[in-house]
Amino acid sequence: MDAHFLKSASDLKDCPQDNIPEICFMGRSNVGKSSLINAFFKKKLAKTSATPGRTQLLNYFEYKDKRFVDLPGYGFAKINKNKKDFITNLLTQFLNFRSNLVGVVLIVDSGVVTVQDQEVVKIILQTGLNFLIVANKFDKLNQSERYFSLKNIANFLKVNFDKCVFASTKTHHNLALVHKKIFELFVEDER
């Protein structure tokens, strides 16, 4: 894909000021957001790190007439309280007030879905945005755990099963389906 990094923004006023539709990627720190973005575009665009909390800005990527935004992770990032509060506020403002935003890709760890993930889903549902939940790192589950895990994730997050999909950025399993479903978020917005 001919995608490229566009810019980083520290708040909404720094975001691109136009009408190009956007999909954002969000999830807990170290869940694999940046790795999923790189796998999605089939090139290293987003910086990855073993250290949780590296992404602390809104990072914009552009592909044709669409934009994708890598949001800072929430959760256990090793950052001070002021920075955590800033990121929480930034995420809330972005989801509620970014008019270009047409969909959310929430990445969760297929082995450990948290109450924080559940709270984020509530916010997404309140916004009325289209969304997809990607259960990443599913390569760590055995075959029998996979179906039940996805069903449990959907039940725990209180969403329809068809809004969830497994993926593995490590093995690239199911990435074609993830790719298709992400682009469907743009199409759903046009209806």
From Swiss-Prot:
InterPro entries: G_ENGB_dom, GTP-bd, GTP-bd_ribosome_bio_YsxC, P-loop_NTPase, Small_GTP-bd. Residues 19-188 form the EngB-type G domain. One of its GO terms (cellular component) is cytosol. Its cofactor is Mg(2+). It comes from the Bacteria. GO terms for molecular function: GTP binding; metal ion binding. The keyword Cell cycle applies. Keywords: Cell cycle, Cell division, GTP-binding, Magnesium, Metal-binding, Nucleotide-binding, Septation. The keyword Glycosyltransferase does not apply. Signal peptide: none annotated. GTP binds at residues 27-34, 53-57, 70-73, 136-139, 167-169. Mg(2+) binds at residues 34, 55. Transmembrane segments: none annotated. SUPFAM superfamilies: P-loop containing nucleoside triphosphate hydrolases. HAMAP family: GTPase_EngB. PANTHER family: ENGB-TYPE G DOMAIN-CONTAINING PROTEIN, MSS1/TRME-RELATED GTP-BINDING PROTEIN. Necessary for normal cell division and for the maintenance of normal septation. Belongs to the TRAFAC class TrmE-Era-EngA-EngB-Septin-like GTPase superfamily. EngB GTPase family. This is Probable GTP-binding protein EngB.
